[in-house]
């Protein structure tokens, strides 16, 4: 059965009961030339543990874009970072709608079968997964709808296509159900005025060469305006899906777990251990560990009166009492577990360039959360190549942020593994926050690595703060400092409190995790996840403005720290950019890349070439190496055979092997000396031939021609 729905600028075609009929729910969705299959499957047996056993997989099939997978194995293997991040978005959007007590292992799989470069696959995939979930026998109150908002020429655009998004200064992705928002991801997209930039200097001068670039931060009011547009579109989409598919939804006969109450345990703990629990909460405010509660549980279980109670029932009841006390204290007294007021930021300390051989580093500590962020600068060859499904060729990523979360940061003895979804998500958020502050014409590739050394909430925002200062410490000409703060929410019985700079305890027992990053002039990135099943704009407004207050407080501290930064120029890479005739680029490369490989190995530099513009970029650790490589390249391109001669090219037709000349040393380079023979024509006397001599410029020297090749002359000393 097929349904065609015109909604939010898109025509969406759904086929139900056509494919994957043994799944609990399945749809084949078409939009433009894109085709997505979304399926939902669940196990019959519930898990014993108290959590939602949901997994989401998003898979892009190479054949969807007419490609064969690259690499040695010609099939899809582990998911790419882009696939993992999309799966995470779908998970975060749908997870809040699962009913309390649902404990069946459930898997949502979204497969891209055909990819249209103009279609937003993230929005399409979420909506397909939402409809498949709604059609299943899993109880859902209504379908989720996802939309994207862009901003072009100052106007907000609903669901921009991929081409329009290239010209947008905003990328806002919102998911919700009816009039409630469930998940938000936003980033500002910088734009740049077309100014020609040319760098012919070592590192120190590169810093002064910038173009006019706007970070395009959004004000709090602009964000609320965009969210209002998104909310209306989500309501339209959610209603349209419900109207079309409600009659096809499977009857639910799923049994939900009833929360087991232990009134006698609850009364006993509240009457006898409330003081100890409050003390435990104060201890837990300094760590993400629950060891203090475990100690109380052991003490209770050792009593004679409690010998028939299970450890699980005592621990669960303790957790409820703890949660209740934390929330009541915040709502009724305006006081948090660590004694802070609702809008107070934890104490901050900052140290920069503490790693003497790293290009730039910052140790950022906020309360019991500590991030060591290290910046490394590299050449074009260090960029990350990413193969996107809808791009014909791999794209080059020149700004990277890697986030690492070892177990010791929360006191756990766990092995360090490859980055998971959480690490990729936090790194991506920090990258989105910092990217607008970096000049797009900055000639170096940048890699930021955040090592979380201690964690008690807001580690991704500590990464943003430390990352912004690490860039400064590496001499990167960032446009503005960027800081981030995590906001929380406690909502109960129509009373609510918004919390600034939440710690792990408040994240765990709170109702919202709302991360906001930006400069003093506005927001560059935000991310919201809600546990309530929806949030209204009035609470969002308070959270945004309270976040601004906290962000500016943090930025003031960061600005003072930035004034004390001493850039360690000795360890920074050096770079020179110059131009040659574009037709000579092939001479620099040589046959099968032989010449450029020789230059790289000989001088210990990296070289990037722009064939169209004739630009040559040389990067290395020593100015002398770079200058020598540049001279070598200029010598190669100055009189190459087969190219048109310019006014500076010399005629070497009268020179022969074995000819002797009384030449003059015109220039000395690390790889040899250039000796003028006659009529302004030079020959290269290689350094290996003059180790025993102490040459100087303008010195007279008797030489003979040993080689004439590709328009170049090499000479030896006469015996």
Curated annotation (Swiss-Prot):
Instruction: Pull one GO CC term from this UniProt entry.
Output: cytosol
* Statement: the UniProt record of this protein carries the keyword Magnesium: yes
Which SMART domains does this entry report, sorted A to Z? KH, S1
Q: Which residues form the S1 motif domain?
A: 658-719
Alphabetized GO MF terms: 3'-5'-RNA exonuclease activity; magnesium ion binding; polyribonucleotide nucleotidyltransferase activity; RNA binding
Give the record's GO biological process terms: mRNA catabolic process; RNA processing
Q: Which CDD domains match?
A: KH-I_PNPase, RNase_PH_PNPase_2
Indicate the segments forming the KH domain, all copies.
Answer: 573-633
Matching PROSITE patterns, A to Z?
A: KH_TYPE_1, S1
Please give the InterPro entries that the UniProt record associates with this protein: ExoRNase_PH_dom1, ExoRNase_PH_dom2, ExoRNase_PH_dom2_sf, KH_dom, KH_dom_type_1, KH_dom_type_1_sf, NA-bd_OB-fold, PNPase
Q: Which reaction does it catalyse?
A: RNA(n+1) + phosphate = RNA(n) + a ribonucleoside 5'-diphosphate
Give binding positions for Mg(2+).
Answer: 507, 513
Q: Which Pfam families does the record match to this protein?
A: KH_1 (PF00013), PNPase (PF03726), RNase_PH (PF01138), RNase_PH_C (PF03725), S1 (PF00575)
UniProt entry keywords in alphabetical sequence: Cytoplasm, Magnesium, Metal-binding, Nucleotidyltransferase, RNA-binding, Transferase
Q: Which cofactor does it need?
A: Mg(2+)
> Coiled-coil ranges per the record?
none
According to the UniProt entry, what is the EC number of this protein?
2.7.7.8
Q: Where in the cell is it found?
A: Cytoplasm
UniProt family annotation? Belongs to the polyribonucleotide nucleotidyltransferase family.
Q: Which NCBIfam families match?
A: polynuc_phos, PRK11824.1
PANTHER family registered for this protein in UniProt: POLYRIBONUCLEOTIDE NUCLEOTIDYLTRANSFERASE, POLYRIBONUCLEOTIDE NUCLEOTIDYLTRANSFERASE 1, MITOCHONDRIAL
The record describes the protein's role as: Involved in mRNA degradation. Catalyzes the phosphorolysis of single-stranded polyribonucleotides processively in the 3'- to 5'-direction.
Query: Can you name this protein?
Result: Polyribonucleotide nucleotidyltransferase
Q: Which organism is it from?
A: Campylobacter jejuni subsp. jejuni serotype O:2 (strain ATCC 700819 / NCTC 11168)
Q: Which gene encodes it?
A: pnp
